[in-house]
């Protein structure tokens, strides 16, 4: 007998993320999930002394608003030659799956998922970033799925 809640049985929503279309669409998709409103996703995600294995049996979803740092410098070891710079964004944190070969396992001490609902802010940030680059002649590689498996969460 399984005493745990089903995966995504609870959805935590930051107060600042409630009005985004992404949040509304996801909440409509999970009408049976219990909705819990929170102030900051960091109060529930990646805290100390969490049991990753227990959480992985019943992960929760956290809908948040990304407040800053939309684009990060990527590793210098991922470069595609001297003419390409590597950057990444974090649209989502963590993964639904538990693949033993994946670097995401162990990247966070939490098995819960964070999805940032303010996608338009990401797009604006990328546009501003591109227009402000000093070395605009160099190509960039921008990963949108560095800290998660975005395709796994598509549907």
Residue ranges of model-derived segments:
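Short, flexible loop/turn elements at secondary-structure junctions
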Residues: 15-17, 91-95, 146-148
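Conserved Radical SAM active-site core
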Residues: 63-64, 68-80, 104-155
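Short alpha-helical segments and helix-capping/turn motifs at coil-helix boundaries
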Residues: 47-48, 85-87, 123-128
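A structural signal for short, well-ordered beta-strand segments and their strand-loop junctions
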Residues: 12, 35-37, 88, 100, ...
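Conserved aromatic-histidine-acidic binding/catalytic patches
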Residues: 10-14, 87-91, 111-114
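Flexible, acidic/Gly-rich N-terminal and inter-domain linker regions that tether
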Residues: 1-85
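Local cysteine-cluster metal-coordination motifs and their immediate loop/turn environment
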Residues: 90-107
